[in-house]
Amino acid sequence: MTSYSYRQSSAMSSYGGMGGGPVRFGSGGVFRAPSIHGGSGGRGVSVSSTRIVSSSSGGYVGGRGGSFSGALTVTDGLLGGNEKITMQNLNDRLASYLDKVRALEQANGELEVKIRDWYQKQGPGPFRDYSQYFKTIEDLRDKILGATIENSKIVLQIDNARLAADDFRTKFETEQALRMSVEADINGLRRVLDELTLARTDLEMQIENLKEELAYLKKNHEEEISALRSQVGGQVSVEVDSTPGIDLAKILSEMRSQYEAMAEKNRKDAEAWYLTQIDELNTQVAVHTTQIQINKTEVTELRRKVQDLEIELQSQLSMKAALEGTVAEIEARYGAQLSHIQGVISSIEVQLSNVRADTERQNQEYQQLMDIKSRLEQEIATYRSLLEGQEAHYNSLSIAKAL
């Protein structure tokens, strides 16, 4: 609020009181030269005066409070015509300026009350404290960053699992190719086994044929021996005194022993060869069977690992999808909250801009008011100089009358 005061210490010949009080002029009386005290908005404007001794005839001049609109009456010859007009104009302009000052200060007071009320209603309070939101936003940003890092780790784990799955798939394909090669070898060995079985059957048939032939030869041999014995017996009975002949029985016995030995040797050789081939085939079959079992076990283990990796991959993909959905939901939710907060901040910034504009406008009005006050003080100074001139003139007249 703007206040101004001006105390007039000089005497004047005739002046209207601002507060409605009269100013009395009398012989040997008291004269009070008024001074102006302007309150806020032009309210409470009062006039004070200093005392001087006057011997002039008195009169009463009335005026209205807060202005110089009252008529200024003086004795004839006290003020000149131009000075009266000047003082009247100054009085009118002073009243007009005081009215303007009062109106402007009243408007300024109303604006200040409105601004104060607006700050009380719209100003930052506990419910307008956004620091907790900032902390929440920072926490959410940290959570989003952590979720992003965790998502990156999961993506890296998924890539590692995919690479491991590709590695296991390559190993599986290699083992499958090895398995197919082993199965091809097994099929070849089966064909060899079939051939050996056929050879064994052929050898058994040959052994049977040899046995039959041996039995047939034994039978023929016995028949020949019987025939020879019968012939030898007949010769012995006929030629009793002849020289001893060849012992055919011994010769036949030796031949039979040699033949049986050869047959037994051939049988044993065939049986040994057959048993050797059978043992070799059994050994190869056992070795390949063991290798097949090992390969089957490895293939089963690899299949189980591949299934476990596929299950883990599906689980990681599901977890990734769930985390991506959670991150998207969090971003959407807190994005909406951030948008709301930004909208609130924008609204507050607009309100602050309006307040700044109102403040600038009030500052401009205040500057205008101060300019008016300066001009008013200049006019009051002019008015004071006129009053001092009239006081000097009045004093000179009083001295002249006294003399």
Swiss-Prot record:
Region (Coil 1A): 83-118
SUPFAM superfamilies linked: Intermediate filament protein, coiled coil region (SSF64593), Prefoldin (SSF46579)
GO molecular function, one term: protein-containing complex binding
Keyword GTP-binding assigned: no
Recorded coiled-coil stretches: none
Stretches the record annotates as Coil 2: 252-390
Region annotated Rod-like helical tail, chain positions: 391-403
Region (Linker 1): 119-136
Modification type Phosphotyrosine: residues: 394
Any one cellular-component term (Gene Ontology): sarcolemma
Swiss-Prot/TrEMBL site (Stutter) positions: 270, 330
Residues that bear Phosphothreonine: 326
Further details from the record: There are two types of cytoskeletal and microfibrillar keratin: I (acidic; 40-55 kDa) and II (neutral to basic; 56-70 kDa).
PANTHER family membership: INTERMEDIATE FILAMENT, KERATIN, TYPE I CYTOSKELETAL 19
Entry similarity comment: Belongs to the intermediate filament family.
Name the UniProt record assigns to this protein: Keratin, type I cytoskeletal 19
Organism this protein belongs to: Rattus norvegicus (Rat)
